[in-house]
Amino acid sequence: MAEKRDYYDVLGVGRDASDDEIKKAYRKLSKKYHPDINKAPDAEAKFKEVTEAYEALSDPQKRAAYDQYGHAGMNGGFGGGAGAGQGFGGFGGGAEGFGGFDDIFSSFFGGGARQQPNGPRQGSDLQYRMDLKFEEAVFGKETKISYSREAECHTCHGSGAKPGTSAETCHKCHGAGQIQVERQTPLGRMMSRETCDVCGGTGKEIKSKCDTCHGTGREEERHTVKVKVPAGVEDGQQMRLQGQGEAGSNGGPYGDLFIVFRVAPSDEFERDGAQIFVEVPISFVQAALGDEIEVNTVHGPVKLKIPAGTQTNTVFRLRGKGAPKLHGTGNGDQNVTVNVVTPKTLNSKQRDALKAFAVASGDSVNPQDSNLFDKILNKKYKK
């Protein structure tokens, strides 16, 4: 298995890169390697690598963990980036995934803060990747998703015991969930505390196990949930659905489901938050004399007035024609960049007209000069 590359190297940014620099790098690379656009054999693998790096560095807590511990810091809390490679995966249990210092010291010395291993525990969180079209991310949508999860057993209702029976206090740990173990070490005899090997730390012993779940109290199910994707979501953002994760243990609540959005790029538009960007070609004549053109927006076509003497790369703003603001009201703007296109071929009438224009402008024109239009544009229309 190939060694993972440094996340900063993957995105091509320095370790002191700002959030905005990381975001811009991700946008550029995700569009470059998106499987819908790039058909190279390794495009999908590179897209996943870029996505995994962005997920780590765009989150302040994950980035801090990565800066301190490297890839090991990612494995402790988030199960190796399951969302980048499959539909859903476990997030892990937050700090529990790393283990606490209390656990480390207490396992050797039998002291420290005692946990309650047989108490209620919340179920694991799950992650689901939802692919969205560009327009779906802009305007939102309602849909249903299905995924597999560990749910409470419908037969024993999570107890793990056969109906009509109940779990008993563990005969070995007496309900504590842990046992004291004495070991001989180079420092002498030492006592340590370990999870009970009979009850698995629950403090309860099931002698008549449920036939459905075989004593686990849980069973796998295909779960369906309705999701309302808010208008204005962006690639890489996530939404939390409380209680839609996996079943807890010992009466604990269900975990949560985190939906991570993957937005396909548009062939026509670029987007940064609520701002939409598009480039539109116009002719030399339209730029010189002015015109009214039709421009596509995410809301439909609109009219845009081009003033006489417009220069190439001029940006016009269409207010309120951008994407809805995710955390606010109203829409952003659409920014239209016009590019003046120089014709590559001319008929005789067009050449004569431009020669006359050059004479009227005081230009000395060599008819064989292939840079005729560059001369005119540079002299008459350059800022």
UniProtKB/Swiss-Prot annotation:
CXXCXGXG motif repeats lie at residues 153-160, 170-177, 196-203, 210-217. GO terms for biological process: chaperone cofactor-dependent protein refolding; DNA replication; protein refolding; response to heat. One of its GO terms (molecular function) is unfolded protein binding. GO terms for cellular component: cytoplasm. CDD domains: DnaJ, DnaJ_C, DnaJ_zf. Keywords: Chaperone, Cytoplasm, DNA replication, Metal-binding, Repeat, Stress response, Zinc, Zinc-finger. Binds 2 Zn(2+) ions per monomer. Its cofactor is Zn(2+). Zn(2+) 2 binds at C170, C173, C196, C199. A zinc finger (CR-type) spans 140-222. Its main location: cytoplasm. Zn(2+) 1 binds at C153, C156, C210, C213. The J domain is necessary and sufficient to stimulate DnaK ATPase activity. Zinc center 1 plays an important role in the autonomous, DnaK-independent chaperone activity of DnaJ. Zinc center 2 is essential for interaction with DnaK and for DnaJ activity. Homodimer. Participates actively in the response to hyperosmotic and heat shock by preventing the aggregation of stress-denatured proteins and by disaggregating proteins, also in an autonomous, DnaK-independent fashion. Unfolded proteins bind initially to DnaJ; upon interaction with the DnaJ-bound protein, DnaK hydrolyzes its bound ATP, resulting in the formation of a stable complex. GrpE releases ADP from DnaK; ATP binding to DnaK triggers the release of the substrate protein, thus completing the reaction cycle. NCBIfam families: DnaJ_bact, PRK10767.1, PRK14276.1, PRK14280.1. This is Chaperone protein DnaJ. The lineage of its organism: Bacteria, Bacillati, Bacillota, Bacilli, Lactobacillales.
